[in-house]
Amino acid sequence: MIDHQALRLFQFCDSQFPTGAFSHSFGLETYIQRGTVHDEESFKEWLRLFLSEQLTYADGLAIRLVYEALNQNDPEKILHLDRMLFVQNMPRETRTGTKQMGTRMVKLANELYDSEWIQWYEAQYNEKNAKLHPAICFTMLGHFLGIDIEMIIDYYLYQNVSALTQNAVRAIPLGQTAGQRVVTDMITFMKTTRDHIFELAESEFGITAPGLEINQMEHENVNVRIFIS
């Protein structure tokens, strides 16, 4: 039997969902211009790195911690995580792009659902107490819909894999079938990533690979671009 609450959250995983994810490569375009990422296999290698580093220690761990804070009714913890996600995101384009995506997701979520936490989160933004991050909004929505934390993380990872793969299809370019092979091949790795997130200590929050951040910073200087970040 279909879990319609899960489908409601899965709607936000659509690569065409209007948060602006289709405009961001999060440094992938820099790797493509250098020739480091140039085909299906090299893209999968980059995608594994992105999931196992930035998405694990930033967004993924934040989702777990925000979910715990929601259960404990701890708004200060959520605001702290919001600030940490923003200030630890060193590349300017990526930091700004993530904030824009978070703002759009929060506004859309508030249009579609009556979640007190998401309404509170947007109010904190209006009062300049929060930056708005898509991982936090996604967690709040999943929590509101009664989705378990494992599925919330799985869906968030899938959302990122799907969006980045569609961007790679355009930018490398890859065929649509090759793109779907990448997503299929990444499903097992997504489970491994999720399991790792549950093993992390909170003190590990924000760890990332310098190479990813450097290439995200250098994206500002690429000669020709089709992505904002």
Swiss-Prot record:
Where does the record place a coiled coil?
none
The organism's superkingdom is given as Bacteria
Q: Which Pfam families match?
A: UreF (PF01730)
- Keyword Chaperone carried by entry: yes
Which molecular function terms from Gene Ontology are attached?
A: nickel cation binding
What are the record keywords, sorted?
A: Chaperone, Cytoplasm, Nickel insertion
Tell me which InterPro entries the record gives: UreF, UreF_sf
Q: Can you name a GO cellular component term?
A: cytoplasm
Where the protein is mainly located, per its record?
cytoplasm
Q: Where in the cell is it found?
A: Cytoplasm
Tell me how this protein assembles: UreD, UreF and UreG form a complex that acts as a GTP-hydrolysis-dependent molecular chaperone, activating the urease apoprotein by helping to assemble the nickel containing metallocenter of UreC. The UreE protein probably delivers the nickel.
Q: What is the purpose of this protein?
A: Required for maturation of urease via the functional incorporation of the urease nickel metallocenter.
Regarding protein family, the annotation reads: Belongs to the UreF family.
What is the name attached to this protein's record? Urease accessory protein UreF
